[in-house]
Structures are given as C-alpha cells and as structure tokens.
Amino acid sequence: MIRALEGNRAMVRSGLLGIIALAFLQGAALAQMHGQHASEAACEEPTLRCATKVTPAFGPDGTLWLAWMAGGQVSVASSPDAGRSFSAPTQVTTKRLNLDWGPDARPKIVVDRKGGIALAFSIFRDEAFNGQVLYTRSSDGGKSFAELRPITANNESQRFEALALDQDGTVFAAWLDKRNRVPAKEAGRRYEGAGLFFASSRDGSATYAEAKLARDNTCECCRLGLTFAAPGRPAVIFRNIFEGGVRDHAVMTFADVSTPGEIHRVSNDDWQINACPHHGPSLTVAPNGTYHVAWYTNGKARKGLFYAHSRDEGRTFSAPMALGQPGRNPTRPYVLASAVGTVMVWKEFDGEKTSVQMTISRDDGETWSPPKTISSTTDTSDHPLLVSNGQQVYLSWMTKADGFRLTAIEDQP
C-alpha cells in the first residue's frame, strides 16, 4: 500500500524575461489546442466514432448517457447495458458550431431522478478564444432538446462551465467569466484572470437564476471541479491567482446555492506563471463528507500530479501525495468517491503508448493500492473520466483507435 505522504491562450503582460519564458508554454498550449482541433476536423461526422470529447452520466434507472462533440456538433445517446450498445444519437445542435475545442473543454451532462437531462457546453465567438456558454434540456428521455440558450445575458467571454446535480433536482452551474475586465480597465485598475460565476436552476435546466460572482481574479483557463458537498451546498475547486501571480488551487464550499463561501488553499505549490496551464483539477466528496482532490502543478515547491484530502469541509488538506511516474508525463487526474472506496485515474505516456493508471483507497484516502494499468492506446485519446451508477464505478475513455470504452473498476486486493 502507498501512504499519502506527498503529494485561453497564454498571455504575457509585462517583462522581457516573462515573454521569453512563456513563449514555449504559449506555443505548446496552442499547439495542443490546434492539434486537437485538426484531429476533430479530420473526422467530419457528428457520430460517436468521430468524437474527441465524450462525457458520461448515469440516469436513475441505470441507463448510461453520453454527450459528445464531433463534426462541430453536440450529440447524445443512451445505453441500457453499460456501453455494449447505444441508441440512435440525438443531435443537440441544429447546425455546425465553432465549439470550444480547448484541452479542458467538453460538453457537460447530468440526469435527474425524473429522467430529465441537463446539458451545457461552450462555443468560440471569435478568433481570440472568447467563449459563450450555452445550455439546454430534454424532458422526453433524450428524444429531443430545447432550443439552445446562453447561460447569461452578458456578452463577455465565458468558458470552462461545469454542472452538478443536487438531490432535490436543482442544477448548479459554474463557469469562468471575463465581464469584470472592461470595468476594471475603464477605472484604471489592472485586471488579472477571470471571475468564477455561478447560477442555479430549479426547473431542470429550463431556466437559470441571474449569474452571480463567487470569486474574482481566478485563473482563466482551467476546468473546474464541481460537486455537492451536502444537500444544497455546492463545492468547487479551481486554480486561483494568489498574491504574486501564483496560480495554485483553492476550494470553495457554498452555504447554499446562492451564497459563496470563503476560499481555502489546497496546497502551496508556488506556481508563479502568467500563462494558461489548461490542466484543471478534480474534486469529489465522499458520503462521510471527506473532500478528495487531485491536480497538476509545475510550481517551485512541487511538480507533477498530486492528491490530497480534507476532513473539515475543505478548510485544511493533507500533505500532497505524488501520483504517477515522473518520467512518463502523468497528466489529467480524476478522482471519484463511492460507497465502496475512492478511485483515482490519470494518463501516462511511455514513449509508445498512452495508458490509464488506476489506484483505489479503502480507508478514506489514508492509503492507496499500487497503481495499475487498466487501459491503453497507441493513438490520441480523451481525458480519462470516472462515473458511477451507485453500485459500480467505471472508467469512461474515448480513444481514436478503439472508440469509446466503459471499463468496470474491478475490486482490488
């Protein structure tokens, strides 16, 4: 067993040394984004076969739902047999759109107890990567979807949306939003990053309440980790901008769906960077209330993938535990707590193939099983995700060579 001991585009605003140091990061981030976009463009059909980003969710009856982006469109399909067969897909979009194809972008989907489906995704509105978050819903079991609507009337850039479903059917949305940059500039103030905004829906994602600011000056370009810590209390992990331009992760737990809480730093990684990592964190809350988080950093204090947990609602966290083999470029961590244990997965590359590594904790994050390869590919692939039907945890992974895979996480000794 392993004990938990360790752990939009780049924008350079000032300084010649900063420009030189960030040139490589900027090129790498844009190359990754354009490379993924080119891969998507090579397969023009809106089918699952052509998908580059696939997001899973289980319905209350055990039906698996997938939402994916392919051919400039967003589609959904369902499977009654854990991914062995799928229904004919339903296109959510009615025409080809300039979908957000950044490394951390994907459609988001949740399915409520009545079978209602809430969906959200973002599009690019211009060549400067300014985005807009759109949402829709289905009330007929995925046969059709309502007309797409913007999640906020504001026209400033919105990206990196996340959805979470409460026990009472409330849908909670959070995203990164740049509406405060223009007022700041007009007032002569420097504005960094973006604002963490949120809104909730009590009618199954038919309408959302007015958007509110939870936290300003957060990192503008990493996915959010969002869940409910308890009924009526969303919790979100995000890359914050701390003093000195340090972009480390923070957790916020809401008092209710309308009231943001204080932020608490997950770890002092000391990653001082004036650029966009495009490598977001993961958050899950166990049935007993323990917060489990996984993240990537390239800070002065530590570099790579790390895990930590909190037993006081995210106020303090355990010492970071390192994940993966540094020589194999571990990336894209995802963690999910279930009634039978907490599972973590991430990707590694050995020079020839990409593998998904998995580890399980049976004691609430104190110790972890030795990492095990549970899937691999020699071609491009999506981020590994975890999904549960309440009884079984699965790895959800889309690969170019083998298509969509749903792999049951088997019990470990």
Q: Each predicted region: which residue ranges?
A:
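Residue-level detector of intrinsically disordered terminal segments
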Residues: 10, 29-32
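Extracellular, repeat-based ectodomains that mediate carbohydrate processing or recognition
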Residues: 32-413
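Exposed, low-complexity/repetitive linear segments and helix-based recognition motifs
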Residues: 3-4, 23, 41
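N-terminal secretory signal peptides that target proteins for export/translocation
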Residues: 1-12
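Bacterial N-terminal signal peptides
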Residues: 15-27
